[in-house]
Structure formats: C-alpha cells, structure tokens
A protein has these predicted regions:
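Acidic, metal-coordinating helix/loop segments flanking the phosphotransfer/catalytic sites
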Residues: 40-58, 122
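His-Asp phosphorelay/catalytic-motif detector in bacterial-type signaling
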Residues: 55-58, 82-87
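Receiver (REC) domain active-site loop signature in two-component systems and cognate sites
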Residues: 65-68
C-alpha cells in the first residue's frame, strides 16, 4: 500500500502484519505528511519483495509476524544486501532484552516499544524517525 507518491520525498517502509498496528504506525507518521512516502508490507516476505523493487530511506519493522518474522527478514535482507545501508528501526510489543540485543546484532539502529498509548508511541516514533532520517 502506498500512501503518497512523490519521487522527491523520503521513502519509509513499514513492515507490520496487524492492520490495527500498521494504522497506528501510519497515524504516528502523519507528522511527516508531505515529506514522506510510506509503503506497507504485511510480513517479512512481502517486505523483501518491495526492497527488490524500490529504495527506502528508512525501514520500520515489527518482530513477530507470520510467514517470515523480523529477525529472519533482517538476516535475509543483509545476506542479499537489500537496503543494507538503510536505517532499520524495530517496532515491537516485546520487552525482552534478548530480542533487543538480537535486533541490534542483526543491524537494527533503534528499537521503539509499541505501547497501547498512541500519544506515547507517536512521540517515541517521531523522535526516532527524525533522529535517523533528517526529515
């Protein structure tokens, strides 16, 4: 799903299997409306397909997904050198330090917890996007 289409904009890939969480993330990105183009993949497999077709400036990825989870996706994208220099931020409900550490080892540059509080999530995600993308 492409939210907008403009070649001059920064391009973000959101990888999220749950429609509610994907919409939650898109709402948090509304602050950047007009300066970003957002594609959504429903799992790691779909994300890899999109990564072969288009360059992204930032990737926001859930860890727990069907077909191919975030960890497996990171392993394959780095192995195939897909978007290997693109900042990848993990968005997850997991509080496990082991998940955070493994994500870092696989190349994630940041880790944002998806809380049920939209304002808190929005604030954390917006700050992280600004930090890594300069929008």
């Amino acid at each position: 799903m492409t939210r907008t289409d403009n070649a001059a904009k920064k391009v973000i890939l959101v990888v999220e299997d749950l429609p509610f969480d994907a919409e939650f993330t898109l709402q948090a990105l509304e602050k950047f409306e007009g300066s970003v183009d957002v594609d959504v993949a429903r799992d790691g497999w779909d994300a890899l397909v999109l990564m072969k077709q288009r360059h992204f400036d930032l990737i926001l990825m859930d860890l727990k997904m069907p077909r191919m989870d975030g960890f497996e996706t990171m392993i394959l994208m780095r192995g195939y050198q897909l978007q290997h220099e693109v900042p990848l931020i993990i968005l997850t409900n997991s509080d496990l330090e082991a998940d955070r550490e493994r994500a870092r080892q696989l190349g994630a540059v940041d880790y944002v917890h998806k809380s049920g509080d939209l304002a808190r999530f929005r604030s954390a995600l917006q700050a992280t996007v600004e930090k890594h993308m300069r929008v």
